[in-house]
Amino acid sequence: MAPEPTPVDAASLTYEAVIGLEIHCQLSTQTKIFSSSSTQFGAPPNTNIDPVCLGLPGTLPVLNEKVLEYAVKAGLALNCQIAPYSKFDRKQYFYPDLPKNYQISQYDLPIAHHGYLEIELVDDKGTARRKKIGITRLHMEEDAGKLVHAGSDRLSGSAYSLVDLNRAGVPLVEIVSEPDLRTGQEAAEYAQELRRILRYLGVCDGNMQEGSLRCDVNISVRPVGSNTFGTKVEIKNMNSFSAIQRAIDYEIERQVAALKAGEPIVQETRLWDEATQETRTMRVKEGSSDYRYFPEPDLGPIEVTAEQLAAWRAELPELPAQKRRRYESEWGLPPQDARVLTDERAVAEYFEATVVAGAPPKLAANWIMGDITAYLKEQKLAIEALPLKPAELAELIQLIEAGTISGKIAKEILPELLSQGGSPKALVERKGLSQISDVATLEAMIDEVLAAHPNELEQYRAGKTKLQGFFVGQLMKKSGGRADPKLANQLLAQKLNPGS
């Protein structure tokens, strides 16, 4: 007779999280997926509507071709297989913001599937670690409307609810990851990298505050080394990447604590509460929902020809990860600099144009990440609207490199250049700010400084050599900051130490 298995002490186990994300991305089309109504955000309630998105009798949907193009481009950028043949399906459920009582989505034949996204995690020492996250599928669907609850942020407890159908019929792609993520940091980086890619493509603006990118998290925990999935919990209501990370970190701790205490994990949907920094129960799931999918009879099959696929693939831009690696390998930038510069496509393009115009890459990176970024934040400007053009920034950097002006002078004229643009060289000439590099002129200035401070000169020659910095400061003051620092220090040392 086989011996009884030894009971496992749950409290002594080490656990790991298993995390997958479902991300809904609103496509940046001018009109809705199956009708001609506008997709403009912030319009007065129920003004961007039409008979099709209201589901009125006798109306027929027509697929917006731009939606298909954007979905395929997103699939290609995520290394997915593109289905040459796919279809739409009806997902049946009742909710007040769903006028047809079904949603047109894709079920068993999505437009893209079996892809991956590589994330890059940089530690405190600046070392990058890469991890490949599988993508199960990407499918197209229409959005539902929006409920506004009076007196509460949810249906329960509200006095009444209002329905705004402006969002009904807005085109979405839903991107479902494999459960390859293990931490809140990995999940947040995955979501950020996905948004970067979509924004580079121009297919989604990724604005989480406006709901253009919405993320649901599926999370369970299991003992390290186990291949069995634990009970899955879904988390909603996270409107920033930081919130995604914090919600996951909290939920991992909650589930591990429950298991170690011998308590079961309930399959449920939970909401992230930003005020309390906790997840709370929204609804308990008794089982998987039966949406009774069947093919959408009012829409024909979707075919993507080899010619279409080749044309759309040729239009893909260089993506963020490709840029980061090029900046590191070709231009020697540190990983963190490369990440900052490639976060926004417009910033990366500005940086590259500055380098092409003749600026050393590291110096261009420093100016863009420092003073220019600070100015853009202060003025709430996009870099595309910056008056200072890349070629003008390159000219400013070249003036410093050539010794025409000092870094201090460059900082002084930068505000005017940022607000008005124009040639830095012309501005320097107009203001008479060129660096003084003439030996005779500098020697005369040094003689005047030394003559004006005999006590300090006597102390210096008596051994208080730290006073050289004082004399340098006085010389820079006398020259209005225009003295060539390197040459000035050299000449000053000769004057202070005659005969040495």
UniProtKB/Swiss-Prot annotation:
It catalyses: L-glutamyl-tRNA(Gln) + L-glutamine + ATP + H2O = L-glutaminyl-tRNA(Gln) + L-glutamate + ADP + phosphate + H(+); L-aspartyl-tRNA(Asn) + L-glutamine + ATP + H2O = L-asparaginyl-tRNA(Asn) + L-glutamate + ADP + phosphate + 2 H(+). Its EC number is 6.3.5.-. It comes from the Bacteria. Keywords: ATP-binding, Ligase, Nucleotide-binding, Protein biosynthesis. Pfam families: GatB_N, GatB_Yqey. The keyword Acyltransferase does not apply. One of its GO terms (biological process) is glutaminyl-tRNAGln biosynthesis via transamidation. Heterotrimer of A, B and C subunits. Allows the formation of correctly charged Asn-tRNA(Asn) or Gln-tRNA(Gln) through the transamidation of misacylated Asp-tRNA(Asn) or Glu-tRNA(Gln) in organisms which lack either or both of asparaginyl-tRNA or glutaminyl-tRNA synthetases. The reaction takes place in the presence of glutamine and ATP through an activated phospho-Asp-tRNA(Asn) or phospho-Glu-tRNA(Gln). This is Aspartyl/glutamyl-tRNA(Asn/Gln) amidotransferase subunit B. It comes from Thermosynechococcus vestitus (strain NIES-2133 / IAM M-273 / BP-1).
